[in-house]
A protein has these predicted regions:
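TRNA-recognition modules of translation machinery and tRNA-sensing kinases, especially anticodon-binding
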Residues: 1-241
Length: 241
């Protein structure tokens, strides 16, 4: 018998991978919206100005179209999409109400600090049918936020302005330290946007909302700096397995 016969190989602990916390959050949101009845649709990250701005009633003079806010291609006709709304526009052009679409993915803006990145993720939704009202929108937003943060979370709606919705609102939740935190934007779809998609605004109305996935993840997991999600720090990321 060889002395090697009594030697057992060392036990090696297996390390299993897991979804990144941003992908976990995005997946959760999409599953939630799917249960409500939203269909996920997809579109390009490199968009035309027409679909990224014009179809959404964002005028040529709007600040969002300036070079210091948007990443333009060399020929200036294409941009890295600044939101996922163009995906819904493309899908609406191929459909007729009632429709309920959600789109999720990377979007790009010229921001970079503790709460903003030049690339981040959005989940947006749009619902168009007869007699859709702001009351329907409020009910839907409460349903989403109660699922995310618990049934006792305090929610407030503040009047706001977006070119593609009218009326528009920003929605805040009350944090544990007593501060209101902006969580999403929403509104009733502007009739101009419906007309651009060949939908009669005299017959149909719609609601729309958009959430920043990183913002949701920061609040849900108590992360103060958005950049932590992308530093490849395994000690940090292993918390989310």
């Amino acid at each position: 018998m060889s002395i090697l016969d009594n030697i057992e190989p060392p036990l090696i602990e297996k390390e299993y991978g897991a979804l990144h916390p941003i992908n976990q959050t995005k997946k959760y949101l999409l599953q939630l919206l799917s249960k409500i009845g939203f269909e996920e649709v997809h579109g390009p990250e490199i968009e035309t100005e027409e679909f990224n701005f014009d179809m959404l009633n964002i005028k040529k003079t709007h600040p969002a179209r300036q070079m210091h806010d948007t990443f333009y291609a060399e020929n200036k006709e294409y941009v890295l999409r600044t939101h996922t709304s163009p995906v819904q526009i493309r899908s609406m052009l191929e459909s007729q109400p009632p429709i309920a679409f959600t789109s999720a993915g990377k979007v790009y803006r010229k921001d970079d600090d503790a709460t903003h990145l030049p690339m981040f993720h959005q989940v947006e939704g749009i619902y168009v049918d007869k007699n859709v009202t702001f009351a329907n929108l409020k009910d839907l937003i409460h349903q989403i936020l109660h699922d995310l943060f618990g049934s006792d979370v305090e929610i407030r709606f503040r009047p706001s302005y977006f070119p593609f919705t009218e009326p528009s609102a920003e929605v805040d939740i009350l944090s544990e330290n007593g501060k209101w935190l902006e969580i999403l934007g929403c509104g009733i779809v502007n009739p101009v946007v419906l007309e651009n998609c060949h939908i009669d605004p005299n017959k149909y109305s719609g609601l729309a909302f958009g959430l920043g996935v990183e913002r949701i993840a920061m609040l849900k997991y108590g992360v103060n700096d958005i950049r932590e999600f992308y530093k490849s720090n395994m000690d940090f990321l292993s918390q989310f397995k």
